[in-house]
Design a protein with these regions (language model features):
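Non-cytosolic membrane-interface motifs at loop->transmembrane helix junctions
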Residues: 82-92, 194, 226-232, 270
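Membrane-proximal first intracellular loop
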Residues: 3-95, 99
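Non-transmembrane, juxtamembrane loop and terminal tail segments
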Residues: 1-2, 115-138, 303-340
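Juxtamembrane interfacial secondary-structure elements that flank transmembrane helices
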Residues: 38-50, 82-85, 101-125, 251-259, ...
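Juxtamembrane membrane-interface segments at transmembrane-helix boundaries in membrane proteins
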Residues: 1-23, 133-149, 179-197, 260-280
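C-terminal transmembrane module of eukaryotic multi-pass membrane proteins
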Residues: 211, 216-330, 340
């Protein structure tokens, strides 16, 4: 007989609370703590960001990865059959974060148009992470075409990731009671099609990182005081750990290391359910440690006047004033010429 997950109705109608109730309690406490810290950070950043609304939007879009992942993990524990929907929601925000990072770098430089103008003709290296090992690649001049190409790589990964996740969600809905169980595993899309899709996803992720890295390294001198690398690494390490730690839990569950009653699981519940609860609790623990570290890097000093963005704006204003003065000085000479 195939092992199936209990529905939320089954859990409510049961005479006893679910055996993973300690996981739910711990996850709830940590999630509430993260949400409280998120509200505090929102109020603090909002106070200093009145003149930088786009920068504030991008910053908080990135920071929401930690509380949102924790909240979705908690929902997956409370409502087991909603795990796939919660996971899709979390991964959707995660892939959108690439766009937030791109836009954040551009706002530091005064916007997209200012970035293109500032970096036009700058020396840049093609061998940037993750292609940094290819030292034989030559240096080239930054161009608008390269900027558009880097943008395209980031948008392509985002769109493909959302489309693939949505497709899995649709197929899961169609599978209804037949999914999930141990024989089918944790993915609805299986076989060669699954291998092709997820391999392509990894390749697109690789190039999305390359596109973001290409823009950053070209403007590295202007962004050196922004801690962009630290901001990106704390986010990316967190999301990569979340993705790859599931392999560890699956191995532990299927070798019965986590499977007896002393860990709070009865044999009537599926191994897949045990994996998900352990994984969800681990996400909550990791988020509560990673979120304060991220807040340390995304401090309110970014909003203080005198940053790169302000300097670019002031430079543009000065340039326009000079042009206006030159035009004004030339107008009387033109009138005298006409009279003569």
């Amino acid at each position: 007989m195939e092992e199936t997950e209990p529905s939320f109705k089954d859990i409510l109608e049961s005479e006893q609370p679910p055996e993973w109730i300690p996981f739910i309690v711990l996850g709830s406490v940590m999630t509430l703590a993260i949400l409280a810290l998120d509200v505090w950070a929102f109020v603090k950043h909002k106070k200093y960001s009145t003149k930088f609304p786009l920068q504030f939007f991008c910053t908080f879009g990135i920071l929401q990865v930690y509380p949102f992942f924790s909240l979705m993990a908690l929902i997956g524990m409370i409502v087991p059959r909603a795990h796939e929907l919660a996971e899709f929601s979390a991964e959707s925000l995660e892939c959108l974060t690439f766009l937030f990072f791109l836009r954040l770098c551009l706002t530091y430089l005064g916007g997209k148009k200012a970035t293109k103008s500032i970096l036009e003709g700058s020396d840049m290296h093609i061998n940037v992470p993750p292609l940094c090992c290819l030292v034989c690649l030559p240096s080239v001049k930054f161009s608008r075409k390269f900027f558009i190409f880097c943008e395209f790589l980031i948008y392509l990964y985002t769109v493909f990731r959302l489309a693939l996740g949505f497709l899995e969600l649709v197929m899961l809905t169609d599978a209804a009671e037949e999914f999930p169980h141990l024989e089918k595993g944790t993915h609805v899309i299986t076989g060669k099609f699954s291998a092709v899709c997820h391999t392509l996803l990894l390749v697109l992720l690789f190039f999305a990182v390359y596109g973001l890295s290409g823009i950053y390294h070209t403007a590295e001198e202007l962004l050196k005081n922004r801690g962009i690398v630290k901001k990106f690494l704390v986010y990316k390490i967190f999301t990569l750990v979340v993705k790859f730690q599931s392999v560890i839990f699956i191995s532990l569950i299927h070798h019965d290391v986590i499977g007896n009653k002393k860990f709070g699981f009865n044999e009537i519940w599926s191994a897949d359910l045990r994996v998900r609860n352990c994984l969800a609790l681990a996400i909550c623990v990791e988020a509560i440690f990673a979120f304060p570290l991220a807040l340390k890097f995304y401090n309110t000093d970014d909003y203080v006047p005198g940053n790169v963005m302000q300097e670019v704006i002031e430079l543009e204003d000065t340039r326009h004033d000079i042009v206006a003065n030159v035009v004004a000085d030339q107008q009387p000479e033109t009138m005298d010429t006409i009279k003569a």
